[in-house]
Amino acid sequence: MSKVQEVLSKLAGKAKAARAALKGDAGVLATLEGEHAEVAMLMKAVLDEGHDDHDPEALECRRELFHKIRIALLAHAKSEEQEFYGVLELRPATRDRATHSEIEHREIEHLIRRLDHMAESDLGWMPTFASLQMKVEAHVRDEETLLFDEAKLVLDKHELREIDERYKAARRRYQELLEGDSHTTHDSGHASV
């Protein structure tokens, strides 16, 4: 079993436990919280496993985990903007918060693009990745506390379930598109945004 497979196997169990621990939120909110938890675990694994800039196995682990994180974050952001923020921007009570969240997505995408253009062995790669992790954590914290609370005030459970169905379909499409684009790469080996 490769180092990456070993890490992913451990994370699969933790992700399942995290999803089971989520209680109370309906529809798209629960889905988004579950995805946030999974990406957080993958990001932690990069920081835990990928520190040696000269070890080929550590670099391969870093490369594969980042590829998964990259696809997860980009598919999540595009789908969330399209299906969740799009609805919230139509409501005066949630418009500003949803717009702010989209701005944070652009900042996250910028950091992903910076990492795309760096070799995983570059000394600046891990500090840039750590910046990405901090930006994602801050975004998730704001979203799950502030935006989700506001969304619960303007959307009923039926609407949250409908948005969830559309979100999941959009995410599958974006994920397939991003995975297909992996064959069209930059010098670093990552797909373009």
How does the language model describe each region?
Residues M1-V193:
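Small-residue-biased structural context
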